[in-house]
């Protein structure tokens, strides 16, 4: 009985020790967690205070680079040449030798018209030629006899002259017959319709078996020359002088075609021609550029964005466009000094596009300027420089001039 009581007592004591240990461990862990949270909150408060006193900003460094000067506009792709194929002779269409949408070369057979009537006409005029040729030969023989008789005074000079005239008439008639033969052969040739230019054929306008008329009454198909291919676009009249100067300085003025969203370069070509007058309703002038189109990336009536390079500014000091600020006094930037304090610096800008701006006056190479976080800045404010997120730095400042197209404009303010 005593042994059983001792066992119960021992078990109770062990359980009490375990409970007490767990209780003290839990309190220690709770106190430690609260301490860490308070420490983190205190650290965050210090960081917030630091950002309040020294606001976080992103900066970029002014650098020297070559800046291309582009002019841009919206253009429409058009075929270099467009031909509506028609028949030059009338007749029944007996065959088509093309598939809709295929490419053809100049001289390829497109269609055939029933040639029998033209073959008959050719045979007819050839027969007439043979008949008149025989008559001419007989008249020439008579002329030889007349000449002999005239020497013997057997016939009058009038009779001889008459025979000479007859021979000449038949000679002229033979020439007319030859012309008729040539015309008949030509008409027979026209019964085989060939491609007048190389290009892409469109949808057929008439089916086999139908009667096709001569001239432009019944078109057969339309062929568009798409390699090379042209783009028609317009620029403001103020840009004419820059384009003409570029033409004078360069044999070929480079023109680039981009897609509708200015995301993908489609083709690069050259300026082909400039219109001779300004559209008074829009204040623009039309221009045409020509592109190689072997890959068929340009299609007639397609809308594209055009970039025309008129100049390149060498050794220019540039900064990101985001760093440029504007006030009633003009353009300025927030320049960062060696102590990471900012000062407002008035600048004069030159060439500017969507990515960067040329600084003509006010900054030097290596100067740091604030690009993001300018709202909280005042003269002499200390700053905390932070790096941009990866998503924000995907298109870096060093790549800004190469990433996507943008129109350029020149300012001096």
From Swiss-Prot:
Q: What is its main location?
A: membrane
- GO molecular function terms noted in the UniProt entry: efflux transmembrane transporter activity
Record key words, sorted: Cell inner membrane, Cell membrane, Membrane, Signal, Transport
User: Domain of life of the organism in this record?
Assistant: Bacteria
Q: Where is the signal peptide?
A: 1-25
**Can you name a GO cellular component term?**
plasma membrane
Q: Localized where? A: Cell inner membrane
UniProt subunit comment: Part of a tripartite efflux system composed of MdtA, MdtB and MdtC.
Identification of the protein by name? Multidrug resistance protein MdtA
| Gene coding for it | mdtA
């Amino acid at each position: 009985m005593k042994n059983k009581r001792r066992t119960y007592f021992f078990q109770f004591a062990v359980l009490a020790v375990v409970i007490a240990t767990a209780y003290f461990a839990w309190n220690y862990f709770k106190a430690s967690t609260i301490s860490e949270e308070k420490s983190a909150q205190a650290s965050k408060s210090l960081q917030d205070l630091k950002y309040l006193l020294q606001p976080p900003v992103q900066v970029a460094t002014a650098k020297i680079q070559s800046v291309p000067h582009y002019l841009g506009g919206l253009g429409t792709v058009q075929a270099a040449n467009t031909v509506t194929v028609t028949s030059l002779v009338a007749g029944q269409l007996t065959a088509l030798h093309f598939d809709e949408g295929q490419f053809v070369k100049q001289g390829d057979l497109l269609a055939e018209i029933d040639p029998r009537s033209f073959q008959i006409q050719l045979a007819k005029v050839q027969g007439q030629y043979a008949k008149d040729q025989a008559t001419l030969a007989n008249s020439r023989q008579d002329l030889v006899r007349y000449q002999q008789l005239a020497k013997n005074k057997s016939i009058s000079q009038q009779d001889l002259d008459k025979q000479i005239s007859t021979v000449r008439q038949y000679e002229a008639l033979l020439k007319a017959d030859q012309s008729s033969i040539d015309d008949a052969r030509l008409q027979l040739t026209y019964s085989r319709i060939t491609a007048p230019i190389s290009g892409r054929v469109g949808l057929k306008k008439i089916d086999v078996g139908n009667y096709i008329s001569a001239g432009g009454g019944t078109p057969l198909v339309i062929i568009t020359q798409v390699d090379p291919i042209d783009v028609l676009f317009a620029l403001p009249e103020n840009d004419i002088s820059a384009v003409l100067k570029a033409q004078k300085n360069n044999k070929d003025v480079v023109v680039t075609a981009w897609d509708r969203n200015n995301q993908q370069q489609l083709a690069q070509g050259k300026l082909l021609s400039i219109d001779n007058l300004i559209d008074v309703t829009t204040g623009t002038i039309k221009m045409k550029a020509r592109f190689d189109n072997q890959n068929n990336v340009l299609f007639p009536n397609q809308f594209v964005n055009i970039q025309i390079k008129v100049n390149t500014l060498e050794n220019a000091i540039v900064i990101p466009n985001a760093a440029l600020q504007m006030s009633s006094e003009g353009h300025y930037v927030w320049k960062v000094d060696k102590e990471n304090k900012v000062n407002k610096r008035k600048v004069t800008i030159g060439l500017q596009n969507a990515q960067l701006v040329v600084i003509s006056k006010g900054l030097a190479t290596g100067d740091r300027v604030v690009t993001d976080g300018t709202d909280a800045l005042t003269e002499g404010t200390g700053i905390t420089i932070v790096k941009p997120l990866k998503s924000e730095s995907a298109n870096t400042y060093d790549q800004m001039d190469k990433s996507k197209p943008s129109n350029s404009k020149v300012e001096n303010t």
